Regions:
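N-terminal, leucine/charged-rich tether regions that mediate assembly and partner docking
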Residues: 2-144
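Sequence-level detector for tyrosine residue identity
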Residues: 12-14, 52, 116, 150, ...
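Short amphipathic alpha-helical molecular recognition features
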Residues: 48-50, 108, 120-128, 132, ...
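Short amphipathic alpha-helical segments embedded in low-complexity Lys/Glu-rich regions
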Residues: 98, 111-114, 153, 216, ...
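Functionally constrained cores in energy, signaling, and assembly domains
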Residues: 106, 168, 222
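A short, charged
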Residues: 126-147, 200-219
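Extended assembly-interface/linker segments at domain junctions
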Residues: 131-192
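Intrinsically disordered, low-complexity acidic regions
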Residues: 175-250
Length: 250
C-alpha cells in the first residue's frame, strides 16, 4: 500500500483545523446527559456494547478493477468499536464506519475468533484476539493524535466492499500495520442509522434550547439589566460590522 507526503500533510492540516472545533463542542455538550438517546442507537440492537466512538481522519479512495484509483478525498469518519461478550474476552468484535457528510456511507466489519485467526496468519499479527480491541483503539487514536506518522486509508470497491489500511510513516518509509475488510451495510441498517442520527440531533438541540431558556429566565429574575445588555449585544455587533465594512470600501 503506497501513500505520499501530500497525503500525510493534508491529513495533518485537516486534523489540526478541526481540533479546536471538536474540543469546544465537547466542552459544551459535556454538561448534558445523553445516555437515554445513546441507548437507542441501532448499533446496540443485537446486544453489542459500544467501547469506542470517535471521529478519525481518513483518506478515502475509490478503486476500480478496470482502472487506476481515483484521487483521494479526506473526511472525518465516525469509527465505532462494538463487542459481543466482555471487553477482555469478546465473542465478536464489530467495526462500524459512518460519515456526517454522506449519510449513506456506512460500512461494517464483523470479526470473531475464527476470522481473526485467518487475519493473524495472513498478516503476521502478534496480538491475541482478546487484545485486538486495544490494538484497534490504539491505531485509531494514533491516527487522530499523530497524523504525520499514522494514516488510515479506506479503499472502496464499486461492488460495495471496502478495506481499511493502517499505515505508519517511518522516515519516509510507509509500513502497512493492519488491514481490515468491510462490507457496505444493508439498506435497512443505513435507514435506521439515518433515522436515529436525525432524531438524536433534534432531541439534543431541543435539550440545549430548553437549557438556554432556563438560564435566560433565571437571569431575567436575578439580573434584569444583564439580560438587557445581552439582548443589545447582537445589535451593537451588527452596527460595528457595518461600520467597518463601510470604512474598508472608502
Amino acid at each position: 500500500m503506497k501513500s505520499n507526503l501530500s497525503t500525510k500533510n493534508s491529513i495533518y492540516n485537516y486534523n489540526n483545523s478541526n481540533n479546536s472545533i471538536s474540543d469546544s463542542s465537547s466542552n459544551v455538550l459535556a454538561n448534558f446527559d445523553f445516555s437515554e438517546i445513546d441507548a437507542k442507537d441501532p448499533s446496540l440492537s443485537e446486544g453489542h456494547k459500544l467501547i469506542y466512538n470517535r471521529e478519525v481522519p481518513f483518506e478515502l479512495r475509490l478503486e476500480d478493477n478496470d482502472g487506476p484509483q481515483e484521487v483521494a478525498s479526506f473526511e472525518a469518519i465516525r469509527c465505532k468499536i462494538l463487542i459481543g461478550g466482555e471487553e477482555n474476552n469478546p465473542i465478536q468484535i464489530r467495526l462500524e464506519l459512518s460519515c456526517e457528510n454522506d449519510l449513506f456511507f456506512h460500512f461494517t466489519s464483523d470479526i470473531d475468533e475464527e476470522a481473526y485467526k485467518v487475519m493473524q496468519e495472513n498478516q503476521k499479527l502478534t496480538v491475541n484476539f482478546s487484545e485486538f480491541c486495544n490494538l484497534l483503539k490504539r491505531l485509531f487514536n494514533n491516527c487522530i493524535n499523530e497524523p504525520q506518522s499514522y494514516i488510515s486509508v479506506f479503499i472502496m470497491q464499486k461492488e460495495g466492499t471496502g478495506r481499511l489500511d493502517f499505515i505508519q510513516n517511518i522516515e519516509y518509509k510507509f509500513i502497512e500495520l493492519l488491514s481490515i475488510d468491510f462490507v457496505n451495510s444493508p439498506d435497512d441498517t443505513v435507514r435506521k442509522q439515518i433515522g436515529y442520527r436525525y432524531n438524536a440531533l433534534r432531541t439534543k438541540m431541543e435539550m440545549m434550547q430548553d437549557r438556554i431558556m432556563t438560564i435566560n429566565n433565571i437571569i431575567k429574575i436575578k439580573n434584569p439589566s444583564l439580560i438587557h445588555q445581552i439582548n443589545k449585544a447582537p445589535y451593537k455587533f451588527n452596527m460595528y460590522a457595518k461600520s467597518n465594512n463601510s470604512s474598508m470600501m472608502k
